[in-house]
Amino acid sequence: MAKIILRHLIEIPVRYQEEFEARGLEDCRLDHALYALPGPTIVDLRKTRAAQSPPVDSAAETPPREGKSHFQILLDVVQFLPEDIIIQTFEGWLLIKAQHGTRMDEHGFISRSFTRQYKLPDGVEIKDLSAVLCHDGILVVEVKDPVGTK
């Protein structure tokens, strides 16, 4: 029986197709910044990537705006229904869990689950936390700046 290797879309994300044209595919294979969703440390990743190669689109890098959230997490949860996702806080930690039962996909049956933990900034209260599930399957969890601070 012949050995078959299935390549998933994560190896070649469509959102970075222009960058693949500017750089060789092998150069991008180990560039972990390509696989990160924007989050608290994405600014550092973008600076590192910009130093390594010329920017493809300068409009993609926007400075943080005054008065907006200072802590934001974006998760791709397109495979989960809103009722499959649990968001909790416990002793200064944000826990995001999701799990769905067995489903049929193009390759057979699959069940998915994940747990992510993030350390919340000091002084953050539960009432300052907001979560939105966007229509494209991105979960946005953010903590708004307290009034009077920058």
UniProtKB/Swiss-Prot annotation:
<dbReference type="InterPro" id="IPR008978">
    <property type="entry name" value="HSP20-like_chaperone"/>
</dbReference>
<dbReference type="GO" id="GO:0005737">
    <property type="term" value="C:cytoplasm"/>
</dbReference>
<dbReference type="InterPro" id="IPR001436">
    <property type="entry name" value="Alpha-crystallin/sHSP_animal"/>
</dbReference>
<keyword id="KW-0523">Neurodegeneration</keyword>
<comment type="similarity">
    <text>Belongs to the small heat shock protein (HSP20) family.</text>
</comment>
<keyword id="KW-0622">Neuropathy</keyword>
<dbReference type="GO" id="GO:0016607">
    <property type="term" value="C:nuclear speck"/>
</dbReference>
<keyword id="KW-0539">Nucleus</keyword>
<keyword id="KW-0963">Cytoplasm</keyword>
<keyword id="KW-0346">Stress response</keyword>
<dbReference type="Pfam" id="PF00011">
    <property type="entry name" value="HSP20"/>
</dbReference>
<feature type="domain" description="sHSP">
    <location>
        <begin position="47"/>
        <end position="150"/>
    </location>
</feature>
<dbReference type="GO" id="GO:0005634">
    <property type="term" value="C:nucleus"/>
</dbReference>
<dbReference type="InterPro" id="IPR002068">
    <property type="entry name" value="A-crystallin/Hsp20_dom"/>
</dbReference>
<dbReference type="GO" id="GO:0006986">
    <property type="term" value="P:response to unfolded protein"/>
</dbReference>
<comment type="function">
    <text>Inhibitor of actin polymerization.</text>
</comment>
<dbReference type="InterPro" id="IPR033894">
    <property type="entry name" value="HSPB3"/>
</dbReference>
<protein>
    <recommendedName>
        <fullName>Heat shock protein beta-3</fullName>
    </recommendedName>
</protein>
<keyword id="KW-0225">Disease variant</keyword>
